[in-house]
């Protein structure tokens, strides 16, 4: 610290104030100190800084279902957003109920976290958050408008509306849905958006075939849909099930997109390499992570009330798996 002070031309007390984020430092002085820190590759002692500031610069994340694309991508987005500013301590649970959530909160608090982000993509995980200790800064991610605390999510309904409108705009008379588990909030909101898109066009929603997010579930749904001659367009609530639908359609002699159009949701890295490349709804997980982090920082500072925040927008990525219906 003394070397930094000499290079910046300030006292070691001023260096300490800059390192510990004290507000009463002139901008030019702060810039000079930060430049000296960078030049000397100075690394503050974390333990000493914690004793001075009572801050650990550590955040907790509670998650379950991290074997699924959505929760895993949310977790990665949060970790990327926090990199270089906060340490992230993760409690990954096989299932999230009130008891396990409370245990995870207590465990993370024991590690000195300043606040906690909960990835809560299902109705049961949202219910688990009811009655959490009020003094713990908590933010929920992935739960739409359902959480009883500060929350942010992707605009699932908006993405499904856009996909449905796109398929109808190509000339399809109806769009069938391969949905997700009934307990999934993402699946519920995407189904609601699909219904709204059909309703806007005056089209009655056909029965939904649900699956467990897997390619096999999509394949089984695709076999059922392939046997219905009127089916010309299918929206899947994730890309993995879309892959299964495409395979089933091909085996049934109904190739995509010349006979049946298929649109997915997520835009996983493999989507552009499907055969054909998949038209899908892209979720902005990096932005979701940044929003969640900003909300938690505000919550820690006492500047954020509970309630849902504006959702993170989606983008329809048009590739080659959807086309106008045959004449």
Locate each region found by the language model:
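N-terminal helix-turn-helix DNA-binding module of bacterial transcription factors
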Residues: 1-57, 326
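Hinge/beta->alpha junction and helix N-cap segments in small-molecule ligand-binding domains
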Residues: 46, 64-73, 91-100, 143, ...
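Short beta-strand segments enriched in small/hydrophobic residues
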Residues: 14-17, 51-67, 166, 174-180
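Glycine-rich phosphate-binding loop signature in dinucleotide/nucleotide-binding domains
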Residues: 40, 110-112, 166, 170-171, ...
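Alpha-helical recognition/docking segments in bacterial nutrient-uptake
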Residues: 58-165, 169
């Amino acid at each position: 610290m003394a070397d930094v002070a000499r290079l910046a031309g300030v006292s070691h007390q001023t260096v300490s104030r800059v390192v510990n984020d004290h507000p009463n430092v002139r901008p030019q002085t702060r810039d000079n100190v930060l430049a000296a820190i960078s030049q000397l590759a100075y690394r503050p002692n974390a333990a000493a800084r914690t004793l001075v500031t009572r801050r650990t610069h550590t955040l907790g994340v509670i998650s379950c279902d991290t074997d699924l694309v959505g929760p895993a991508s949310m977790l990665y987005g949060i970790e990327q957003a926090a990199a270089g500013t906060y340490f992230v301590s993760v409690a990954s649970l096989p299932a999230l109920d009130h008891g396990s959530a409370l245990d995870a909160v207590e465990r993370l608090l024991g590690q000195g976290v300043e606040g906690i982000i909960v990835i809560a993509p299902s109705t049961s995980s949202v219910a688990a958050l009811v009655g959490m200790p009020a003094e713990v800064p908590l933010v929920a991610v992935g739960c739409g408008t359902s959480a009883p605390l500060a929350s942010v999510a992707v605009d699932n309904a908006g993405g499904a509306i856009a996909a449905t409108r796109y398929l109808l705009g190509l000339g399809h008379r109806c769009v069938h849905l391969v949905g997700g588990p009934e307990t999934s909030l993402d699946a519920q909101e995407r189904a609601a958006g699909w219904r709204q898109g059909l309703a806007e066009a005056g089209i009655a929603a056909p029965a939904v075939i649900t699956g467990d997010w897997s390619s096999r579930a999509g394949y089984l749904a695709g076999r059922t849909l392939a046997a219905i001659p009127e089916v010309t367009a299918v929206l899947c609530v994730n890309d993995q099930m879309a892959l299964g639908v495409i395979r089933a359609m091909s085996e049934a002699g109904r190739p995509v997109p010349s006979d049946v159009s298929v649109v997915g949701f997520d835009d996983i890295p493999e989507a552009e390499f499907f055969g054909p490349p998949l038209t899908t709804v892209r979720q902005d997980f990096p932005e979701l992570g940044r929003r969640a982090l900003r909300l938690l920082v505000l919550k820690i500072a006492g500047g954020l009330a509970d309630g849902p925040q504006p959702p993170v927008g989606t983008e329809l990525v048009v590739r080659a798996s959807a086309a106008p219906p045959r004449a």
